[in-house]
């Protein structure tokens, strides 16, 4: 029977430690980490994510603010809002909730954020730092996965890691983080032939494709570690991941559940990176 990798419990533990660090920072330096979340439009799923971030920031003891903007806002107007918070010393982290309306260029908006305040880790400068082995701001989901692997003492050096999904948010940065730990990494996608056969060689399998229960037992080798990033609804409307959990757990050594695995760690890493940005602001 597999060990269930409890991301929720790890997130709670890290959040408690973060509260203590924030309290010490406030006491010693008179600085409170500040996070502003900019929300364009009224996407229901995005609203849920934003509320979760608000709660986490408040719990950590941050100064936080949510800016709600009309879906009809122009790209230039949105950039002006971002520039305002780039210049505001009270805010150390700026997050623009994605997706954005079609008339706004996501890349132009990401470029507008000060890289020092880009707590999502999507600015090309932060991406470049990651690929050059000098990461500062790292996309939060891959960062959270690395914390889970560390917590459960998963050996990466010399191991074979396979990632399903090549997004800029998870797959690509995840590959680089694993390479930094001396894993041998294969990044797969929708055009990868014989996908199950490729995945079956993995000591560590990370799945991030957004397809409910796509990965079955034929994809995993005996004793593998499986990280499920997906969050979907099955035919009965229940939350599930990209991995068929009930099938796969009988074959692997460790696996993250959905919910309660990767998800809680993503928001926790967002808070941690905001705290780290506040620390770096002391150095100018």
Curated annotation (Swiss-Prot):
Positions bound to NADP(+): 165-167, 190, 231
GO terms assigned for molecular function: methenyltetrahydrofolate cyclohydrolase activity; methylenetetrahydrofolate dehydrogenase (NADP+) activity
Similarity-based family: Belongs to the tetrahydrofolate dehydrogenase/cyclohydrolase family.
Enzyme Commission code(s) on record: 1.5.1.5, 3.5.4.9
This protein's pathway: One-carbon metabolism; tetrahydrofolate interconversion
Reactions accelerated catalytically: (6R)-5,10-methylene-5,6,7,8-tetrahydrofolate + NADP(+) = (6R)-5,10-methenyltetrahydrofolate + NADPH; (6R)-5,10-methenyltetrahydrofolate + H2O = (6R)-10-formyltetrahydrofolate + H(+)
Top-level taxon: Bacteria
This protein's GO CC annotations: cytosol
TM annotation in the entry: none
NCBIfam families: PRK10792.1 (NF008058), PRK14179.1 (NF010776), PRK14186.1 (NF010783)
Stored InterPro entries: Aminoacid_DH-like_N_sf, NAD(P)-bd_dom_sf, THF_DH/CycHdrlase, THF_DH/CycHdrlase_cat_dom, THF_DH/CycHdrlase_CS, THF_DH/CycHdrlase_NAD-bd_dom
Subunit field text: Homodimer.
Protein's name in the database: Bifunctional protein FolD
Taxonomic classification: Bacteria, Bacillati, Bacillota, Bacilli, Lactobacillales
GO BP, sorted A to Z: L-histidine biosynthetic process; methionine biosynthetic process; purine nucleotide biosynthetic process; tetrahydrofolate interconversion
UniProt entry keywords in alphabetical sequence: Amino-acid biosynthesis, Histidine biosynthesis, Hydrolase, Methionine biosynthesis, Multifunctional enzyme, NADP, One-carbon metabolism, Oxidoreductase, Purine biosynthesis
General function of this protein: Catalyzes the oxidation of 5,10-methylenetetrahydrofolate to 5,10-methenyltetrahydrofolate and then the hydrolysis of 5,10-methenyltetrahydrofolate to 10-formyltetrahydrofolate.
PROSITE patterns, per database record: THF_DHG_CYH_1, THF_DHG_CYH_2
């Amino acid at each position: 029977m597999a060990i269930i990798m409890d991301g929720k419990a790890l997130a709670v533990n890290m959040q408690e430690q973060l509260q203590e660090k924030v309290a010490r920072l406030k006491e010693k330096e008179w600085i409170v980490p500040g996070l502003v979340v900019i929300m364009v439009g009224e996407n229901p799923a995005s609203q849920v994510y934003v509320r979760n971030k608000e709660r986490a920031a408040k719990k950590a003891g941050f100064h936080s603010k949510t800016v709600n903007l009309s879906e009809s806002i122009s790209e230039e107007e949105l950039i002006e809002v971002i520039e305002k918070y780039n210049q505001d010393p009270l805010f150390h982290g700026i997050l623009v909730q994605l997706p954005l309306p079609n008339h706004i260029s996501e890349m132009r908006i990401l470029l507008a954020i000060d890289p020092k305040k880009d707590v999502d880790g999507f600015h090309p400068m932060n991406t470049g730092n990651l690929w050059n082995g000098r990461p500062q701001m790292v996309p939060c989901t891959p960062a959270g996965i690395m914390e889970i692997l560390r917590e459960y003492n998963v050996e990466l050096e010399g191991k074979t890691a396979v990632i399903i999904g090549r997004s800029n948010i998870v797959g690509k940065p995840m590959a680089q983080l694993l390479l930094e730990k001396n894993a041998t990494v294969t990044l797969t996608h929708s055009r990868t032939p014989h996908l199950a056969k490729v995945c079956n060689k993995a000591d560590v399998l990370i799945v991030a494709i957004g397809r409910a229960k796509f990965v079955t037992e034929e994809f995993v080798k005996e004793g593998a570690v499986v990280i499920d990033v997906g969050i979907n609804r099955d035919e009965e409307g229940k939350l599930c991941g990209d991995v068929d959990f009930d099938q796969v757990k009988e074959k692997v050594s460790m696996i993250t559940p959905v919910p309660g695995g990767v998800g809680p760690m993503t928001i926790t890493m967002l808070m941690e990176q905001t705290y780290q940005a506040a620390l770096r602001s002391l150095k100018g």
